[in-house]
């Protein structure tokens, strides 16, 4: 069984900054794919509460399946304002999508972050354990 991950990648033009139309125009702006080894590696942060872990997975599936959520860094807070179940066409970027999923799963807003400070901000919330860097043989989920 493959491990599936979800993420916000780029807008309908293949850009990562701004200028896209709200909502997912291509079905690939915010979507799921098989887990892969990223060139920069992965840090694994595991929810301390199994219920939160399950809700995180549910949240990402909901967000990735919601065609009202697209990608635009300059409009990244739309998903925080409207939530992952939004009926309003809105935007996110990779870090604001993670934040919105944490809010859905835990009921707690861990605060604003971007990919450069994501790990320490999320860990400061007390909701997650730092499992370190992903490596071959690492168990992602028991």
Which ranges hold each PLM region?
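N-terminal capping segments
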Residues: 1-112
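Activation targets extended, charge/polar-rich intrinsically disordered C-terminal tails
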Residues: 96-142
